[in-house]
A protein has these predicted regions:
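Conserved phosphate-donor/acceptor-positioning beta-strand/loop module used by diverse small-molecule
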Residues: 4-28, 86
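PAPS-dependent sulfotransferases, especially Golgi type II membrane carbohydrate sulfotransferases
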Residues: 27-69, 77-144
Length: 144
């Protein structure tokens, strides 16, 4: 981020934040490609999440006018408000059609390949709560 922000002072960056517990649980449930061994243990995921969060906060503090912190929960609850805000930050035109992701025929090859073909919804952010007994205190050190 730093090199790009300095090399391209007009560059804009999009930083998507989601509930820390939902993010960590989603990582735990996902079978990532080889080399992502941190995602096999909740303790390692929490450590990885915290390191990423601290690093991103460093960049946000250093380049506040170039980095847009996008609140995932706010977006899924009010996409017609928060979608246009992001596009405005990026100096792009907004269209309500962008919210009709379930109509897209574009191939998706990410861990979210099935979810992105559905309508925007907020239910996945609470899935971790179904496993609270299994999770125990593993999320107690999370940075929000």
């Amino acid at each position: 981020v730093g090199f790009l922000a300095l090399a391209y002072p007009d560059a804009k960056f999009f930083y998507s934040k989601r509930d820390a517990r939902a993010t960590c649980w989603s990582n735990y449930e996902t079978a990532f490609a080889e080399g992502n061994f941190y995602s096999h243990r909740l303790e390692d995921i929490v450590d990885h999440y915290n390191r990423c969060t601290r690093l991103m906060q460093f960049w946000v503090d250093l380049f506040p006018s170039q980095i847009y912190t996008f609140d995932y929960e706010k977006f899924v609850s009010s996409p017609t408000i928060y979608g246009p805000d992001l596009f405005n930050f990026l100096n792009l035109d907004w269209s309500p059609f962008y919210l009709e992701v379930s109509r897209s025929t574009t191939e998706v090859t990410t861990a979210s390949q099935f979810q992105v073909k559905e309508k925007i919804y907020s239910g996945s952010s609470d899935q971790w709560k179904n496993f609270i007994l299994r999770i125990g205190t593993r999320f107690s050190n999370l940075i929000e």
